[in-house]
Amino acid sequence: MPKTPTISFVSLGCSKNLVDSERMLGLLGQHGYVLVPDAQPSDLVVINTCGFIDAARQESIGVIEEMLERKRSGAVRGVIVAGCLAERQKESLLEQFPEVDHVVGVFGRDEIARVADRLLGGLDEQRSLFRPAPVQAQDDRARLRITPRHFAYLKVSEGCDRFCTFCAIPFMRGKHITKPIEMVVAEAEELAADGVRELILVAQDMTYYGLD
């Protein structure tokens, strides 16, 4: 009988990133992966990183180093780095950390289960997955929530058009894309059915909703 694959997950950064983490966890669960606490041994660990400010980047790098040490000790078989730091640094992250097995950019999140399957199956010679920013909002339903049961974050848009000098968000998250109100309502209904009583709307630029 084949062993059930296990995965641990570290979610860093903002609430928007947490929504992405929950979406990836949901997809991995649908593909048969069992989530285990990150202190326990697992087949794979996914680190959903933040790359916004220097302190966040340093935190992400510290967690990558910690998980690579666990890989050396045999506690995990593979390390996948996803999210904003991966999107910002791309393949240079593999040069900095050659023991990382795969990097997945922000817009490759919905392919995380395929990446995990190929990695465990020894099929994935390519070590990076980066997709262009989509022209339509991504569907965040079918999440495995890691917030307390009574509340959840609901992402109503992605990206930003402002390109402020001090901010890297447009380079990591792309241009602003409004999530259609029908999709927002459908996600809200799904979350309410899952026991959520407090919805927190999040976006990179909430005041720009519907103006793109």
What does each of the following model-derived ranges do?
Residues 1-209:
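Proteins enriched for Cys/Gly/acidic motifs involved in redox and nucleic-acid/cofactor modification
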